[in-house]
Design a protein with these regions (language model features):
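Conserved ABC ATPase signature
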Residues: 142-146, 150-152
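The feature captures the beta-strand-to-loop junction immediately N-terminal to the Walker
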Residues: 41-43
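Catalytic Walker B motif of ABC-type/P-loop ATPase nucleotide-binding domains
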Residues: 167-170
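Conserved ABC transporter NBD signature motif
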Residues: 64-72
Length: 255
């Protein structure tokens, strides 16, 4: 079943008076099925983060339309948009976006607090999430007291606590060491195996190889796609790196 669809997304930024407009996205179209794990790969400035922000309703396209479960995001306004984002989407960012004055517990529960979820239900949801991510002992700590990997696991807990239809991840391993990156990717694998739909923007071939499908973006356009099928993560990683090498050899920009 189709969960997300982007139709001919274009984004143009106007520069200062007299300057030439900057086209960040040039007619991007694709869809994501429920339960898929899709990665979008591209170099810095390729348009991948702009695309993610539009899919997340954090930015609006100059033209084109995004649908989630058949509902056009263009038709959702104001407070309804904030509620839609809070209830349907989960976010994992490179820099964690945790509130320093909130404990780990409070950071995780924030989406439920904003949704006015009853306290008993919040606690009921919290326990299995933090147990599965191994952060139960950290609940009363503040972000400054925990490691980068622990911060990102806290961010994942916050993303899944509201049981979103779609998790959007923007360079989630970018600020992590190799060990913490692998732990996070294993968590994404497990979430996907449990039926969670994920869309991840990354420049890392290793991170992308954990997805089931990879879309490649350059100069605001999708130019290639790889599907993992029954291949192992290692074999898919080799295919991704080979595809990137070929794209560079043919005049494309290295990722």
């Amino acid at each position: 079943m189709e969960l997300l669809r982007a139709e001919n997304i274009q984004k143009v930024y106007n520069t200062r008076a007299g300057g030439k407009p900057c086209r960040a996205l040039a007619g991007v179209s694709f869809s994501v099925e429920a339960g898929e794990f899709v990665a979008i790969m591209g170099a810095s400035g390729s348009g991948k983060s702009t695309l993610l922000n539009i899919l997340a309703t954090l930015d609006t396209p100059t033209s084109g339309e995004v649908f989630l479960e058949g509902q056009s995001m263009k038709q959702i306004k104001g407070k309804n948009l904030a509620a839609f984002r809070r209830e349907k989407l989960g976010f994992v960012f490179q820099d964690f976006n945790l509130l320093d004055t909130f404990t780990v517990r409070d950071n995780i529960l924030l989406p439920l607090v904003l949704s006015r979820t009853p306290l008993a239900e919040m606690e009921q949801r919290l326990k299995p999430v933090v147990a599965s991510l191994g952060i139960e002992p950290l609940l009363e700590h503040f972000p400054v007291e925990i490691s980068g990997g622990e911060k990102q696991r806290t961010a994942v807990a916050r993303a899944v606590i509201n049981e979103p239809r779609l998790i959007l991840a923007d360079e989630p391993t970018g600020a992590l060491d190799s060990r913490s990156s692998q732990q996070l990717l294993n968590i994404f694998d497990r979430l996907n195996e449990q039926g969670q739909t994920l869309l991840m923007v990354t420049h890392s071939s290793l991170a992308a190889s954990h997805a089931r499908r990879v879309l490649f973006i350059r100069d605001g356009k999708l130019f290639a796609e790889l599907c993992r099928g029954d291949q192992s993560q290692q074999v898919f990683y080799d295919r991704i790196t080979a595809s990137l090498s070929m794209a560079t050899h043919q005049g494309g920009e290295s990722l």
